[in-house]
Swiss-Prot record:
Gene Ontology biological process: translation
Record's keyword annotation contains rRNA-binding: yes
Stated role: One of the primary rRNA binding proteins, this protein initially binds near the 5'-end of the 23S rRNA. It is important during the early stages of 50S assembly. It makes multiple contacts with different domains of the 23S rRNA in the assembled 50S subunit and ribosome.
Identification of the protein by name: Large ribosomal subunit protein uL4
Gene this chain is encoded by: rplD
Transmembrane segments: none
Organism: Rhodopseudomonas palustris (strain BisA53)
Length: 206
């Protein structure tokens, strides 16, 4: 699969050959969905907490005698049916993470990349560098490329000027190749890869 390479200024910079094993698959939405669910579950804080009857600070004395009052039998004021009592089956601090095999995660990433390529949402640029961290200049470059919502993936190290300039632009994410993931690929309209990112992906899945 051959794709044109452009510069940030929108000039032609040749072409690149993309591996069909990574970018040319028939996308499987079920595998992509499994990976997205895994990612979103893993990032949940799980810090929700409600006090149960054992954690409520209240007297443990029996409310009134067992017999002779005509009222229902009660032993504790900490039970859920009373105002101020403990919560029955309330949320507890826990991890929401689920297991997903590494092979399935790797497969999902390939299918997400293939889905972008199939939909025409994949752009390859020669490099993502700026001499100075000027957001205004980068906004102009993105307008020329037609980027309003994009995930930009560079090599192992980001260019500091580019990363700082892009930080304040809405709907633009910049990540090193180590941070590429299915959810971020899907949540933006365009996926922009540098040539270094393409080489790193092909080396990763070789």
């Amino acid at each position: 699969m051959e794709l044109k390479v452009t510069t940030l200024e929108g000039k032609d910079a040749g072409s690149v050959q993309l591996s069909d094993e990574i970018f040319g698959l028939d996308p499987r939405s079920d595998i992509i969905q499994r990976c997205v669910i895994w990612q979103l579950a893993k990032r949940q804080a799980g810090t929700h907490k409600a006090k149960g009857r054992a954690e409520i600070w209240r007297t443990g004395k029996k409310m009134y005698k067992q017999k002779g009052t005509g009222g229902a039998r009660h032993g504790s004021q900490r039970v859920p049916q009373f105002r101020g009592g403990g919560r029955a089956f309330g949320p507890v601090v826990r991890s929401h993470a689920i297991d997903l095999p590494k092979k399935v995660r790797a497969m999902a990433l390939k299918h997400a990349l293939s889905a972008k390529a199939k939909d025409g949402g994949l752009i390859v640029i020669d490099q993502a560098t700026l001499d100075s961290a000027k957001t205004k200049a980068l906004v102009g470059h993105f307008a020329g490329l037609g980027l309003t919502s994009a995930l930009i993936i560079d090599g192992a190290e980001l260019n500091n000027g580019f990363a700082v300039a892009a930080r304040n632009i809405p709907n633009i994410d910049v990540l090193p190749i180590q941070g590429i993931n299915v959810y971020d690929i899907l949540r933006r309209q365009k996926l922009v890869l540098t040539k270094a990112a393409v080489d790193a992906l092909e080396a990763r899945f070789k």
